[in-house]
A protein has these predicted regions:
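Short, solvent-exposed loop/linker segments at the N-terminal edge
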Residues: 1-9, 100-114, 205-206
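Aromatic/hydrophobic beta-strand junction motif of beta-rich domains
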Residues: 13-19, 118-124
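Short beta-strand segments within Ig-like beta-sandwich modules, predominantly Fibronectin type-III
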Residues: 38-44, 143-149
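Surface-exposed, short loops/turns at beta-strand junctions within beta-sandwich domains
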Residues: 51-59, 156-164
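Flexible, low-complexity linkers/stalks enriched in Thr/Pro that connect modular domains
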Residues: 75-101, 180-206
Protein backbone atom coordinates (compact mmCIF):
# COMPACT_ATOMS: atom_id res chain seq x y z
CA UNK A 1 0.00 0.00 0.00
CA UNK A 2 1.04 3.58 -0.50
CA UNK A 3 1.06 4.42 3.22
CA UNK A 4 3.99 2.03 3.81
CA UNK A 5 2.29 0.51 6.86
CA UNK A 6 1.77 -3.25 6.79
CA UNK A 7 0.95 -6.26 8.93
CA UNK A 8 3.13 -8.50 6.75
CA UNK A 9 6.43 -9.39 8.41
CA UNK A 10 8.04 -10.18 5.05
CA UNK A 11 8.26 -7.07 2.90
CA UNK A 12 8.58 -6.66 -0.85
CA UNK A 13 9.63 -3.16 -1.93
CA UNK A 14 8.78 -1.93 -5.43
CA UNK A 15 10.15 1.14 -7.15
CA UNK A 16 10.89 2.88 -10.40
CA UNK A 17 13.52 4.88 -12.26
CA UNK A 18 12.87 7.94 -14.39
CA UNK A 19 15.10 6.47 -17.12
CA UNK A 20 16.79 3.17 -17.90
CA UNK A 21 20.21 2.54 -16.40
CA UNK A 22 23.31 2.95 -18.51
CA UNK A 23 25.76 0.11 -19.11
CA UNK A 24 28.01 1.24 -16.25
CA UNK A 25 25.20 2.03 -13.79
CA UNK A 26 23.37 0.01 -11.17
CA UNK A 27 20.53 0.58 -8.70
CA UNK A 28 21.21 -0.44 -5.11
CA UNK A 29 19.36 -0.72 -1.81
CA UNK A 30 20.62 -0.44 1.78
CA UNK A 31 18.91 -1.84 4.87
CA UNK A 32 21.45 -0.58 7.41
CA UNK A 33 21.62 3.16 6.95
CA UNK A 34 23.99 3.09 4.00
CA UNK A 35 26.73 0.91 5.50
CA UNK A 36 26.23 -1.86 2.95
CA UNK A 37 24.49 -1.86 -0.42
CA UNK A 38 22.76 -4.61 -2.39
CA UNK A 39 22.36 -4.56 -6.18
CA UNK A 40 18.72 -4.44 -7.28
CA UNK A 41 17.20 -6.40 -10.14
CA UNK A 42 15.98 -3.81 -12.65
CA UNK A 43 13.63 -4.43 -15.56
CA UNK A 44 13.39 -1.41 -17.81
CA UNK A 45 12.57 1.41 -15.42
CA UNK A 46 11.13 -0.69 -12.57
CA UNK A 47 12.80 -2.56 -9.74
CA UNK A 48 11.68 -4.96 -7.02
CA UNK A 49 13.39 -6.09 -3.82
CA UNK A 50 12.31 -8.93 -1.53
CA UNK A 51 13.52 -8.43 2.03
CA UNK A 52 14.45 -11.91 3.23
CA UNK A 53 14.18 -10.99 6.91
CA UNK A 54 11.17 -11.82 9.07
CA UNK A 55 10.47 -8.41 10.59
CA UNK A 56 8.95 -7.66 13.98
CA UNK A 57 6.92 -4.59 15.00
CA UNK A 58 8.86 -1.43 14.30
CA UNK A 59 10.02 1.07 11.68
CA UNK A 60 12.50 0.03 9.01
CA UNK A 61 14.27 2.39 6.62
CA UNK A 62 15.08 1.42 3.04
CA UNK A 63 17.57 3.59 1.13
CA UNK A 64 18.07 3.35 -2.64
CA UNK A 65 20.55 4.94 -5.00
CA UNK A 66 21.86 4.91 -8.55
CA UNK A 67 25.65 4.56 -8.78
CA UNK A 68 28.10 4.02 -11.61
CA UNK A 69 31.22 1.90 -11.78
CA UNK A 70 33.38 4.88 -10.83
CA UNK A 71 31.44 5.36 -7.59
CA UNK A 72 29.55 8.45 -8.70
CA UNK A 73 26.17 8.55 -6.98
CA UNK A 74 23.21 9.93 -8.89
CA UNK A 75 19.61 9.74 -7.70
CA UNK A 76 18.83 8.69 -4.11
CA UNK A 77 15.69 8.07 -2.10
CA UNK A 78 14.69 6.64 1.28
CA UNK A 79 11.47 5.33 2.75
CA UNK A 80 10.42 4.26 6.24
CA UNK A 81 8.21 1.16 6.39
CA UNK A 82 6.18 0.47 9.54
CA UNK A 83 5.56 -3.15 10.54
CA UNK A 84 2.53 -3.50 12.82
CA UNK A 85 1.51 -7.04 13.73
CA UNK A 86 -0.59 -6.08 16.78
CA UNK A 87 -4.39 -6.07 16.60
CA UNK A 88 -6.43 -3.17 18.04
CA UNK A 89 -7.43 -3.48 21.70
CA UNK A 90 -11.15 -3.46 20.86
CA UNK A 91 -11.88 -7.19 20.66
CA UNK A 92 -15.63 -6.73 20.14
CA UNK A 93 -17.97 -4.47 18.23
CA UNK A 94 -21.75 -4.75 18.54
CA UNK A 95 -24.79 -3.35 16.74
CA UNK A 96 -27.16 -2.32 19.52
CA UNK A 97 -30.08 -0.66 17.77
CA UNK A 98 -31.52 0.90 14.66
CA UNK A 99 -33.29 4.24 14.72
CA UNK A 100 -37.09 4.04 14.70
CA UNK A 101 -37.23 0.28 15.27
CA UNK A 102 -40.98 -0.04 14.71
CA UNK A 103 -41.20 -3.83 14.84
CA UNK A 104 -43.15 -5.71 17.50
CA UNK A 105 -39.97 -5.59 19.55
CA UNK A 106 -37.89 -2.43 19.76
CA UNK A 107 -34.78 -4.55 19.27
CA UNK A 108 -35.77 -6.83 16.37
CA UNK A 109 -34.17 -4.59 13.71
CA UNK A 110 -37.44 -4.40 11.76
CA UNK A 111 -38.66 -0.94 10.85
CA UNK A 112 -41.08 0.89 8.60
CA UNK A 113 -38.64 3.81 8.38
CA UNK A 114 -36.73 3.74 5.09
CA UNK A 115 -34.05 6.18 6.28
CA UNK A 116 -32.16 4.67 9.19
CA UNK A 117 -29.17 5.08 11.44
CA UNK A 118 -27.37 2.45 13.48
CA UNK A 119 -25.57 2.64 16.77
CA UNK A 120 -23.46 0.24 18.76
CA UNK A 121 -20.66 -0.36 21.22
CA UNK A 122 -16.93 -1.10 21.14
CA UNK A 123 -15.26 -3.47 23.59
CA UNK A 124 -12.44 -0.97 24.18
CA UNK A 125 -11.49 2.53 23.11
CA UNK A 126 -9.83 2.91 19.73
CA UNK A 127 -6.14 3.66 19.73
CA UNK A 128 -4.18 5.85 17.35
CA UNK A 129 -4.49 4.40 13.86
CA UNK A 130 -7.53 2.27 14.78
CA UNK A 131 -10.84 2.54 12.94
CA UNK A 132 -14.38 1.22 13.39
CA UNK A 133 -15.84 0.68 9.94
CA UNK A 134 -19.07 -0.37 8.27
CA UNK A 135 -19.73 -2.06 4.93
CA UNK A 136 -23.03 -1.95 3.04
CA UNK A 137 -21.90 -4.10 0.10
CA UNK A 138 -20.72 -7.37 1.56
CA UNK A 139 -17.26 -6.14 2.48
CA UNK A 140 -16.26 -4.74 -0.91
CA UNK A 141 -15.91 -1.22 0.49
CA UNK A 142 -15.66 0.14 4.04
CA UNK A 143 -16.52 3.49 5.63
CA UNK A 144 -15.39 4.81 9.02
CA UNK A 145 -18.25 5.22 11.50
CA UNK A 146 -18.45 8.07 14.00
CA UNK A 147 -16.96 7.06 17.36
CA UNK A 148 -17.24 8.75 20.74
CA UNK A 149 -15.59 6.83 23.55
CA UNK A 150 -17.00 3.31 23.35
CA UNK A 151 -20.06 4.27 21.29
CA UNK A 152 -20.34 4.41 17.51
CA UNK A 153 -23.04 5.72 15.16
CA UNK A 154 -23.69 5.54 11.44
CA UNK A 155 -26.32 7.33 9.36
CA UNK A 156 -27.30 5.46 6.19
CA UNK A 157 -27.93 8.24 3.70
CA UNK A 158 -29.87 6.04 1.31
CA UNK A 159 -33.66 5.91 0.98
CA UNK A 160 -34.18 2.17 1.29
CA UNK A 161 -36.74 0.08 -0.53
CA UNK A 162 -38.51 -2.73 1.29
CA UNK A 163 -36.19 -5.66 1.92
CA UNK A 164 -33.35 -6.97 4.05
CA UNK A 165 -30.07 -5.08 4.35
CA UNK A 166 -26.90 -6.59 5.82
CA UNK A 167 -24.59 -4.23 7.69
CA UNK A 168 -21.08 -5.52 8.45
CA UNK A 169 -18.86 -3.92 11.10
CA UNK A 170 -15.19 -4.32 11.91
CA UNK A 171 -12.36 -2.81 13.95
CA UNK A 172 -9.16 -2.42 11.93
CA UNK A 173 -5.89 -0.52 12.20
CA UNK A 174 -3.81 1.27 9.58
CA UNK A 175 -1.73 -1.86 9.02
CA UNK A 176 -4.80 -3.98 8.26
CA UNK A 177 -4.97 -5.91 11.54
CA UNK A 178 -8.62 -6.77 12.29
CA UNK A 179 -9.58 -7.35 15.92
CA UNK A 180 -13.39 -7.56 15.82
CA UNK A 181 -16.21 -8.18 13.34
CA UNK A 182 -19.98 -8.46 13.45
CA UNK A 183 -22.97 -8.15 11.15
CA UNK A 184 -26.64 -7.26 11.47
CA UNK A 185 -29.56 -7.63 9.07
CA UNK A 186 -32.10 -4.80 9.13
CA UNK A 187 -35.53 -5.36 7.57
CA UNK A 188 -37.37 -2.46 5.93
CA UNK A 189 -41.14 -3.03 5.68
CA UNK A 190 -43.26 -0.03 4.73
CA UNK A 191 -46.27 -2.01 3.45
CA UNK A 192 -49.35 -2.03 5.70
CA UNK A 193 -51.37 -5.24 6.10
CA UNK A 194 -53.89 -6.01 3.34
CA UNK A 195 -56.81 -3.60 3.85
CA UNK A 196 -59.26 -6.20 2.53
CA UNK A 197 -58.60 -8.31 5.59
CA UNK A 198 -60.76 -6.96 8.39
CA UNK A 199 -60.98 -7.75 12.06
CA UNK A 200 -64.12 -7.32 14.16
CA UNK A 201 -65.46 -8.00 17.65
CA UNK A 202 -68.65 -9.99 17.16
CA UNK A 203 -69.85 -10.93 20.62
CA UNK A 204 -69.00 -11.99 24.14
CA UNK A 205 -69.61 -15.29 25.81
CA UNK A 206 -72.25 -15.06 28.52
Amino acid sequence: ANDFITNDSQVVVNGSLTAQLGNNEKAQISLDGGTTWIDLTVTGTTWRYTDGRTLTDGTYQYQVRVIDNAGNVGATDSQDVVIDLTKPAAATITVDSVSQDTGLSDSDFITSDNQISLKGTLGAALGSGDHAQISLDGGATWTDVSVSGLSWTYVDGRTLADGDYNYQLRVIDDAGNISATTSQVVTIDTVAPDASKTIAIDSISD
